[in-house]
């Protein structure tokens, strides 16, 4: 925020505070939504990923630093991702037999953290290879997130399809979005 976007340290710090507040507030909202609409949890996850990717695409497509209002919006949207990732634990708990629950929870945990760490490392490697913390270096480095989102979206869609087949075999037929 300070290097590529040219923000002061105090403004960057304020954005981090906004991030924490957005994560707390969205955690409460997502908890209510997943409790009220349990068969729509995958849509919540997909919406969060698409919103994050869209915000990053907008910010990274700009020819120069983003206006502060757009950075605030970016921070709010990407801050929903933390609480949103917890939905994966809820899905693993709901749709796996108790004998496999530990493995399922472990896969959700390690998958999310491993993807995050690999993205962070790749961003660092790209920044180093490009010679520093310029706006253009950050723009290129932050593009590494997009393939991860694509893989994650494909994974959510594939597991949702399998889960719906299992539910259908048990006589449970979730309504499509058109039917809701």
How should each PLM-predicted stretch be described?
Residues 139-158:
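Symmetry-related core transmembrane helices of the 12-TM Major Facilitator Superfamily/SLC fold
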């Amino acid at each position: 925020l300070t290097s590529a976007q040219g923000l002061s340290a105090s403004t960057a710090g304020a954005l981090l505070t906004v991030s924490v507040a957005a994560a707390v507030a969205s955690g409460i909202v997502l908890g209510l939504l997943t409790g009220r609409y349990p068969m729509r949890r995958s849509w919540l996850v997909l919406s969060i990923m698409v919103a994050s990717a869209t915000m990053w695409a907008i910010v990274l497509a700009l020819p120069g630093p983003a206006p502060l209002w757009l950075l605030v919006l970016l921070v709010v949207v990407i801050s929903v991702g933390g609480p949103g990732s917890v939905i994966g634990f809820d899905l693993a708990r709901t749709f796996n037999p108790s004998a496999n629950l530990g493995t399922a929870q472990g896969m959700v945990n390690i998958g999310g953290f491993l993807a995050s760490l690999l993205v962070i490392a790749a961003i660092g490697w790209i920044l180093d290879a490009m010679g520093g913390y310029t706006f253009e270096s950050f723009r290129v480095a932050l593009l590494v997130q997009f393939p991860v989102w694509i893989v994650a979206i494909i994974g959510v869609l594939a597991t949702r399809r399998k889960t719906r087949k299992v539910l259908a075999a048990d006589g449970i037929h979730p309504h499509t979005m058109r039917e809701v």
